[in-house]
């Protein structure tokens, strides 16, 4: 997460977007991948650590709802998803991952060309912050 490069805008040295292209298409795809990765990470830890299942289920559902708003969960490489082996470290690890996702969603909301997308991403960041409070 967090490695966006600013593409040249129309008239700034690069080919401009076609008149029908949505300028936020690439951003939405990147955000959807980040949310899907977070969802998979939470799900892997929920399955590996049954005593935490109830606590992690609401976070997993939040990511699924957020992904649905953007078109649905996408596949993420299984090699990038691993459950924390020690149960006592799960919540701290997920807390750090969720913090990074929250910060990225805030940055993405600023990058969005569409006001509606900016508002949606900011709302998602707030939702993640609320869930993090319970980790």
Question: Which sequence ranges carry the predicted segments?
Answer:
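All-alpha RGS (Regulator of G-protein Signaling) helical domain and cognate RGS-like helical scaffolds
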Residues: 1-135
């Amino acid at each position: 997460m967090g490695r966006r490069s600013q593409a040249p805008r129309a008239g700034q040295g690069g080919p401009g977007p076609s008149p029908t292209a949505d300028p936020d298409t690439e951003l939405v795809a990147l955000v959807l991948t980040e949310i899907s990765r977070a969802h998979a990470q939470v799900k892997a830890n929920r399955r590996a650590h049954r005593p935490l299942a109830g606590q992690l289920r609401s976070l997993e559902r939040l990511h699924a709802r957020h992904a649905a708003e953007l078109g649905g969960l996408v596949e993420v490489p299984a090699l990038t998803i691993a459950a924390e082996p020690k149960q006592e470290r799960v919540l701290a690890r997920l807390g750090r991952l969720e913090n990074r996702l929250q910060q990225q969603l805030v940055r993405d909301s600023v990058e969005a060309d569409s006001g509606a997308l900016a508002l949606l991403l900011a709302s998602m960041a707030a939702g993640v912050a609320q869930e993090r409070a319970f980790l």
